[in-house]
């Protein structure tokens, strides 16, 4: 007998706030706890009924912040807690792990998603190798064994843009459209956002035009010596560092019946994949292709909604072109490019966006796709089905 698909009974997220903004004094558990409390209240489920919390996080520097979060949110001390770090993929991978716990019968009620307090991330230092030498600060850990395999993410995206022929103007047009969509749909997205520190909407989206975009500072080009800006990346075409959290409530059919919960969506399939670490942004498309096959779909165009966490404008352009998707089909309310990038939370936020759009546009047998690429050449994607009206 096939295992029943895990059900999704509730979801919520915080606003996304740029680093050193309104959330700058909050720890990751302090951003995430109100989100979890809200999604449980929306479902009508007691905090003591949660079997496990799975949280994606990239910057808290260990210590299993999911356990701290579970206790801070008032969940039972018996609640299991797992912290998962697959960088940008972590929020979606955490939900996949939660779904696997339910599908395997190890849990019946799981809260899963991601959270990041980039503003409070620890300063990283390598310990001195010898007595009397100094500790050495570093920005991030290595994602691949050699420097050639592990380029700076901005440089990697700029190289890909140049090699694939995506111009700065094309990238800026994509970014402007993302911000325009986000601003136009703030009222719609307010329903999924839990107010924290008085912030009720994503802070970063702004009104832009081509003239203003052209004045944005450059952050990466393929060859600084040649000063070739044709395919360069600017602050507009790269997702901003940010704080935020997003979680979903996963339940088994048994728990749904026992606790009289209303299932709003079904977790159909998930895929994780790796690709060349030199071009990590391509992993989202590869993961999407794999999960579509697992879910029994031959074409991404059959998805009613598609959410991509687009850390770079060139990534969004490449993803849509590679899968043959229409512009309006991908990130219809704006994506990570206009929201910001709270690394461990970003993919979970994209999932919440997808779930909200599926619920707000009910049609029979409707499916959606969410995808993300992560540092080191990782990709993660999932297919979700709505509950038919």
Residue ranges and their predicted role:
Residues 56-108, 147-152, 212-240, 321-352, ...:
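Conserved catalytic cysteine-centered active-site region
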Residues 13-14, 25-26, 42, 170-258, ...:
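N-terminal extracellular/periplasmic Venus flytrap/periplasmic-binding protein-like
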Residues 13-37, 60, 82-96, 108, ...:
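Active-site pocket-shaping loop/turn-to-helix segments
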Residues 86-116, 161-189, 248-254, 320, ...:
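Active-site-proximal alpha-helical scaffold in enzymes
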Residues 268, 274-338:
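Active-site pocket-lining segment
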């Amino acid at each position: 007998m096939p295992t029943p698909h895990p059900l999704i009974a509730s979801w919520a997220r915080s606003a996304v706030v740029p680093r050193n903004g309104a959330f700058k004094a909050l720890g990751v558990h302090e951003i995430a706890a109100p989100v979890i409390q809200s999604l449980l209240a929306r479902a009508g489920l007691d905090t003591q009924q949660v079997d496990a919390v799975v949280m994606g996080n990239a910057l808290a520097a260990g210590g299993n912040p999911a356990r701290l979060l579970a206790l801070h949110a008032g969940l039972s001390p018996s609640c299991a807690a797992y912290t998962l770090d697959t960088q940008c993929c972590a929020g979606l991978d955490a939900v996949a792990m939660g779904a696997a716990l339910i599908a395997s019968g190890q849990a019946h009620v799981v809260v899963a998603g991601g959270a990041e307090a980039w503003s409070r991330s620890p300063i990283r230092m390598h310990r001195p190798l010898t007595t009397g030498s100094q500790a050495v600060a570093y920005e991030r850990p290595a994602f691949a064994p050699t420097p050639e395999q592990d380029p700076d993410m901005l440089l990697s995206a700029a190289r890909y843009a140049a090699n694939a022929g995506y111009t700065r103007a094309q990238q800026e047009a994509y970014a402007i459209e993302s911000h325009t969509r986000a601003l136009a749909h703030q009222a719609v997205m307010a329903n999924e956002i839990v107010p924290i520190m008085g912030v009720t909407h994503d802070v970063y989206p702004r009104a832009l035009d081509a003239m203003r975009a052209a004045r944005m500072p450059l952050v990466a080009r393929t060859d600084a010596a040649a000063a070739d800006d044709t395919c360069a990346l600017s602050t507009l075409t790269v997702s901003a560092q940010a704080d935020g959290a997003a979680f979903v409530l996963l339940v088994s059919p048994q728990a749904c019946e026992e606790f009289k919960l209303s299932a709003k969506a079904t977790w159909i399939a998930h895929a994780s994949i790796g690709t060349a670490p030199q071009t990590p942004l391509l992993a989202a498309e590869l993961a999407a292709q794999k999960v579509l096959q697992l879910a029994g779909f031959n074409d991404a165009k059959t998805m009613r909604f598609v959410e991509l966490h687009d850390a770079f404008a060139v990534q969004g352009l490449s993803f849509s072109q590679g899968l043959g998707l229409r512009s309006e089909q991908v990130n219809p309310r704006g994506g990570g490019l206009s929201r910001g990038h709270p690394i461990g939370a970003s993919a979970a936020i994209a999932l919440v966006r997808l779930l909200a759009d599926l619920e707000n546009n009910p049609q029979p047998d409707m499916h959606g796709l969410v995808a993300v690429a992560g540092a080191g050449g990782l990709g993660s994607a999932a297919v979700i089905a709505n509950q038919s009206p």
